[in-house]
Amino acid sequence: MKHPEKWRDSIDPFSLPFKNFHLIEVIGYPHAGNDVFQVKGIYKNEIVEAYIKVARQFGADIENEINTIAAIKCDLAPSIIDYDDEKKYFCVSLAKKGERLSSIVGDNSNRASLDYLYEYGNALAKLHATEGIFPDVKDRKFFHIPDKEYFRELGIKFVYDYLISNQPQRINKCFCHGDFHYANILWQQKHISAILDFELSGWGNKEFDIAWALILRPGQKFMNTYEEIYLFMDGYQSEGTCNLDYVKYYMILIYSYFYKIGRTNVEYRSYVKNVFLDYCK
């Protein structure tokens, strides 16, 4: 199996102060905001495959990920086996088996995604039902409406008008994953085998968390039809409840950022523009 090659300068993982884990070799360099290393090492006298995450980007919260995974006791979450004394700098988790949906469906020409999206939505609803006391999710720019000039420069002022006029009357709070998009979900035999990356998790906005999972990213080959979105939502609503109008609102809010992020992708930008025209009626 081909692993991601080194793509930028990063810390030397062999310099980390491991306590429970002995690093043998680095076998891959997954793309991520933080420095992430796919490695082999020794844990409890056995050779294991693991991932090392080292804080790099602004807002990294290794401690939140460690504490959340310990609190929720979710079998699909990674098992964290080592970290620094302050839980601020790095953590090591055992590798989970599975593939991302993007790898499984390829160009999705045969609509293979339809076999997965019901369970995808159902899994998020189950996470949202998690009980406990959690810190509030950290504030993110995506939670807020950009100023009017931002929309004018992009030629979509009507989206600004929609967002200002249709703001949700309340925020429905629950435990949120914070980044439940397809790259953080692994699958085996058409079932979810792992849920990754709990750094952004906490007590937050249920419908925003759903919308974040639903939006199409640049280059993504699924979740670009109403049939797929409805299937995800059917799965969600089989386990939980939500306000569908709020979900739609937050999809538009997030897309207002991704319209600019994906501006060099003509096909993607056209898709998002059509979503605006359809939803912002």
Could you describe each region identified by the protein language model?
Residues D35-K40, I164-F208:
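Active-site acidic catalytic loop and adjacent metal/ATP-binding pocket
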Residues F208-G240, I252-Y268:
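Active-site activation/catalytic loop segments of kinase-like enzymes and analogous catalytic loops
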Residues E99, I104-F158, I171-K173, G202-W203:
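A cross-family kinase active-site recognition segment
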Residues M1-V26:
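Juxta-kinase regulatory segment immediately upstream of eukaryotic protein kinase catalytic domains
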Residues C91-E99:
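Short pocket-lining segment of the protein kinase catalytic domain that shapes the ATP-binding cleft
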